Amino acid sequence: MRCWSPCSLLVVIAIYCLSSHTSEAFDLAQACVESQRLSLLPICDTIFAVQQEGAQQSADDGLRSKRFIRFGRALSGDAFLRFGKNVPDLPFEDKRFLRFGRAAPQLDDLLKQALQRVESLQKSDDTSVRRKRSTDAAPQSNTDSAEQKNDSAKITKRYVDDVEDSDVKRFMRFGKRFMRFGRNPSDVGSKLTEKRFMRFGRDPEKRFMRFGKSDDKKFMRFGRNPGDAEDELEEDKRFMRFGRGDEEDEEEAEKRFMRFGRDPEKKFMRFGKNGEEKRFMRFGRNPEEPEADKRFMRFGRGGEEDDVNTEEKRFMRFGRSAEKCKGCLEG
């Protein structure tokens, strides 16, 4: 059997003494906690004081351990980056940090308490806490505020002069139901410039969108004229027309538009200057001429030299022809 060295013997003796003392102290502390008679002894008071000091020291160590960078979920709910020193005397945690996520409920409680204190002080002292200077007028008494409310309740309509009304035509107004752009008609001395606008209302002349400087051919108009039933231009107001309209050549000008209405001649979209009306799309039946076959779209020029068969091949037709229906019935 190998002999023990003096150093090893000293280590074993020290460990035995420490373990025996710690076991005795633990047994004594447990006995002080469990037994009410032993808790009255002075040694038990000393043990309780040591335990409280140890708990306070562990709490201080926990506060000091907050000077770190933590990532992920923490058991204490502190997902933050903190820098600086912690003061253990403060009842709340140090605020020199960057925190991400939800704050601890203790901090919310402290903020609520601070706000309640400020409100209570303000109500008791009748003073307002200002954080910056204000340029508002001094507060008035209750009687002045009541008179001001009564005065504000009375609203009168502003008088508009005719000159001012003519000057404000270059804007978008809601109330007179139009949007107008361009020059003032008083500057030019003509009403032609009034046609560069979009107007909406009950007046039949104002239900259109018009663009251009001169005649009525460059606009889109919708609606009927109920007050003037004998007007020749009543049917001409349900269309969209594009291009220039010359007074000398009204027939060609009428073919550059899309017209909608009950008149069978005006249920079509026509493009071009061809007088033979071959470049258009027409829809609807003609009650006076049932064999006119106007339900088609035609493209190309149709001259007088071409045969009828060649003219009929340059379009797309929808519907039944009267001659073909007769042939089908006879067959």
UniProtKB/Swiss-Prot annotation:
Q: Where are the transmembrane segments?
A: none
Please describe the organ and tissue distribution of this protein's expression: Present ubiquitously in the brain and regions of the central nervous system as well as in the periphery and throughout the dermal chromatophore layer (at protein level).
Stretch forming the signal peptide: 1-25
Where does the record place the region Disordered? 122-153
> Which keywords does this chain's UniProt record carry?
Amidation, Cleavage on pair of basic residues, Neuropeptide, Repeat, Secreted, Signal
Propeptide span(s)? 26-65, 86-94, 103-168, 184-194, 203-205, 214-216, 225-236, 245-254, 263-265, 274-277, 286-293, 302-312, 321-331
Phenylalanine amide-modified residues are F71, F83, F100, F174, F181, F200, F211, F222, F242, F260, F271, F283, F299, F318
| Compartment(s) | Secreted
Give the GO biological process terms.
neuropeptide signaling pathway
Pfam families noted in UniProt: FARP
- Annotated GO CC locations: extracellular region
UniProt main location, coarse? secreted
Q: Does the keyword Nucleotide-binding apply?
A: no
Q: Which family does it belong to?
A: Belongs to the FARP (FMRFamide related peptide) family.
Described by its record, this protein's role is as follows: Excitatory neurotransmitters that directly modulate chromatophore function by activating chromatophore expansion at the chromatophore neuromuscular junction.
Which protein are we looking at? FMRFamide-related neuropeptides
**Species, as recorded:** Sepia officinalis (Common cuttlefish)
Gene name in the database record: FMRFa
